[in-house]
C-alpha cells in the first residue's frame, strides 16, 4: 500500500476541486496513483475535470525576443517576487534572452554554463537562489509575441497579419490551449478521454451501446476545448478563434506558452499542516 501523504492529497484537491476526505479516499483506492485517482473521480462524478499537473508557485520572469523567422522565450526563476523586480536580476535575465536570440537553437545547458559566473555572483550579492530554467524557440513566417506582466509569455507563428496574431497570442495566454486545431489532438489523448466519457455515461445508467453513441458529441466538444482554433475567442466569444482567423485572412501554424514557475511547488506550510491532520501527520 502506497503512503498517502499530505502533499499528495493537496495536489489532488487543487487539481480536482474536491474535498480533502474525498481526495484521500480516492488516493487510497488508487494506491497512491494520482492520475488513476483523477480518472476514477471523474467517472464517479466527484470531479468534472482535472487541472493539469504543475502548480505555478516559483517567482521570476518570462522574456521574449523576435528574430528573423523565429522567436524565443526564456524563463529565469528566483525565490521571491521582490527579487524578480530587482534591477540586477532583470539585467541578467535580459542578457540571457539576448544571448538566446543571437545564438538560435542554444540549449538550456549552454545558457546555464555561459552565465554561471554571473549567476553565482548575483546569488552571493542578493542572497537568494536563482536559475535559468527554460528556453524555447518557435519558427514561423510571421511571429507575434505577448507578455502578460512578465509572468506569462506567448509566441504565435503563422501567416498573415502580425496585429491579428498578437490578438491570438493574448487569447493563448488567457485560455491555455494545448493544440492548434481539433484534429491535432493526439490519438492517445482522444482515446483516454473517450473511455472516461463512456464510463461516466455507463455509471449514470446508460447502456453501453447508447453510451458510446453519446460520447461522439462530447468528444467533439472536448477536442474543441483543448485546441486553439476550436476555443471561443476571448475578444469575441460569439465566434471561435478559427472563425475569427478566417475572417481576417490569417493562419496560425504553431504557438508556445510559458508561465513562470509551472511545475514548481512553493511550500504552503499552513495548508499542508491542515491536510496533515487528516492524513495522520504525513507530509
Swiss-Prot record:
Q: Tell me which family the UniProt entry assigns to this protein.
A: Belongs to the EF-Ts family.
Which segments carry the region annotation Involved in Mg(2+) ion dislocation from EF-Tu?
80-83
Predominant location category: cytoplasm
Its taxonomic placement starts with: Bacteria, Pseudomonadati, Pseudomonadota, Gammaproteobacteria, Pasteurellales
The record's NCBIfam families line, in alphabetical order, gives: tsf (TIGR00116)
Q: Does the keyword Kinase apply?
A: no
Could you tell me which Gene3D superfamilies the record lists for this protein? 1.10.286.20, DNA helicase RuvA subunit, C-terminal domain, Elongation factor Ts, dimerisation domain
The protein depicted here goes by the name: Elongation factor Ts
Q: Name one GO cellular component term.
A: cytoplasm
The protein's job, in short, is: Associates with the EF-Tu.GDP complex and induces the exchange of GDP to GTP. It remains bound to the aminoacyl-tRNA.EF-Tu.GTP complex up to the GTP hydrolysis stage on the ribosome.
GO molecular function per UniProt: translation elongation factor activity
Q: Which sequence ranges form a coiled-coil region, renumbered to this chain?
A: none
Kindly list the places in or outside the cell where this protein is found, as annotated in its UniProt entry.
Answer: Cytoplasm
Q: Which CDD domains does the entry link to?
A: UBA_EF-Ts
Q: What UniProt keywords are attached to this protein's entry?
A: Cytoplasm, Elongation factor, Protein biosynthesis
Q: Which InterPro entries match?
A: EF-Ts_dimer_sf, Transl_elong_EFTs/EF1B, Transl_elong_EFTs/EF1B_dimer, Transl_elong_Ts_CS, UBA-like_sf
Amino acid at each position: 500500500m502506497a503512503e498517502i501523504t499530505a502533499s499528495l492529497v493537496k495536489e489532488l484537491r487543487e487539481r480536482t476541486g474536491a474535498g480533502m476526505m474525498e481526495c484521500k479516499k480516492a488516493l487510497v483506492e488508487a494506491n497512491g496513483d494520482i492520475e488513476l485517482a483523477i480518472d476514477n473521480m471523474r467517472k464517479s462524478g466527484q470531479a468534472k475535470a482535472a487541472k493539469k499537473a504543475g502548480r505555478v508557485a516559483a517567482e521570476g520572469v518570462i522574456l521574449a525576443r523576435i528574430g528573423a523567422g523565429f522567436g524565443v522565450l526564456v524563463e529565469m526563476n528566483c525565490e521571491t517576487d521582490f527579487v524578480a523586480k530587482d534591477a540586477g536580476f532583470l539585467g541578467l535575465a535580459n542578457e540571457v534572452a539576448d544571448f538566446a536570440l543571437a545564438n538560435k537553437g542554444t540549449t538550456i545547458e549552454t545558457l546555464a554554463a555561459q552565465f554561471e559566473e554571473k549567476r553565482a555572483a548575483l546569488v552571493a550579492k542578493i542572497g537568494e537562489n536563482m536559475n535559468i530554467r527554460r528556453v524555447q524557440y518557435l519558427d514561423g513566417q510571421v511571429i507575434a509575441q505577448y507578455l502578460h506582466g512578465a509572468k506569462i509569455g506567448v509566441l504565435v507563428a503563422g501567416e498573415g497579419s502580425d496585429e491579428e496574431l498578437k490578438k491570438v497570442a493574448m487569447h493563448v495566454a488567457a485560455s491555455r490551449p494545448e493544440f492548434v486545431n481539433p484534429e491535432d489532438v493526439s490519438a492517445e489523448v482522444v482515446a483516454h478521454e473517450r473511455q472516461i466519457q463512456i464510463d461516466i455515461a455507463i455509471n449514470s445508467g446508460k447502456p453501453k451501446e447508447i453510451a458510446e453513441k453519446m460520447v461522439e458529441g462530447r468528444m467533439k466538444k472536448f477536442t474543441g476545448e483543448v485546441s486553439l482554433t476550436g476555443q471561443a475567442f476571448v475578444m469575441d466569444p460569439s465566434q471561435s478563434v478559427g472563425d475569427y482567423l478566417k475572417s481576417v485572412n490569417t493562419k496560425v501554424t504553431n504557438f508556445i506558452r510559458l508561465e513562470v514557475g509551472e511545475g514548481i511547488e512553493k511550500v504552503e506550510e499552513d495548508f499542508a499542516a491542515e491536510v496533515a491532520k487528516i492524513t495522520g501527520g504525513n507530509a
